[in-house]
Amino acid sequence: MLNLAGSLTQGTVTWMTGPRTLGDHTAPTINAAAERAGRPAPRVVAALPVCVTADVDTARTRAGEEFQVYGMLPSYRAMLDREGAEGPADVAIVGDEDVVAAQVRALADAGVTEFVASCFGSREERDRTRSVLRSLL
């Protein structure tokens, strides 16, 4: 699919695909296909659950519960397996403001051109998450 997307489309959008898979598989594959087709570099949009929190363990448990279904769907399961992730909680971006900001920034190093955050957690955590994300614009 990435070869087809790179040769015919403007890019791809991922969900539940972690940074290692984005950097080692997704971005290089779609970019190489675009180059072979003489097309401009495609967009690589990554979407992941994000929570700024002081309680990382609880947030990861919550992510595992809220996003559990994605670990059971074959296409998402394949990306989680490629990442070495047991489930969605393992690819969720979770931590304090500095940790979350660093992990979001690192996605660009993996070849991501745009990021979509699915904020989760308590109202306070979602507010903190949105604040960090705004600071990265």
Indicate residue ranges for each PLM-predicted region:
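Active-site-adjacent structural elements that line small-molecule/cofactor binding pockets in enzymes
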Residues: 1-137
